[in-house]
Swiss-Prot record:
Keyword rRNA-binding listed: yes
Name of protein: Small ribosomal subunit protein bS18c
Segments forming a coiled coil: none
Gene name of the encoded protein: rps18
NCBIfam families on file: S18 (TIGR00165)
InterPro entries on file: Ribosomal_bS18 (IPR001648), Ribosomal_bS18_CS (IPR018275), Ribosomal_bS18_sf (IPR036870)
Quaternary state and interactors: Part of the 30S ribosomal subunit.
Compositional bias segments (type: Basic residues): 1-19
Keyword set includes Ribonucleoprotein: yes
Keywords assigned by UniProt, alphabetized: Chloroplast, Plastid, Ribonucleoprotein, Ribosomal protein, RNA-binding, rRNA-binding
Amino acid sequence: MDKSKRLFRKSKRSFRRRLPPIGSGDRIDYRNMSLISQFISEQGKILSRRVNRLTLKQQRLITIAIKQARILSSLPFLNNEKQFEKTESIPRTTGPRTRNK
């Protein structure tokens, strides 16, 4: 093979298939909090199917289970885990007020 053509060939990378996040024995249910919590973001939002690497049917079942858990108060609708750090409050100094007429 010509040296100039060798530069444009793609290198062979090993392909490793990722394991599916839901096994065949896992039941998608609103009571299975350990499974449901994997598919929720830090803000409490349901992650997309592309991020989760789920099939369409699995994503639908996960979404329904999360919504049921929220309605039954097992899961919060919003996750306020991030507490805002309190910064030192700077007292406002207002000078003497003058009226402009």
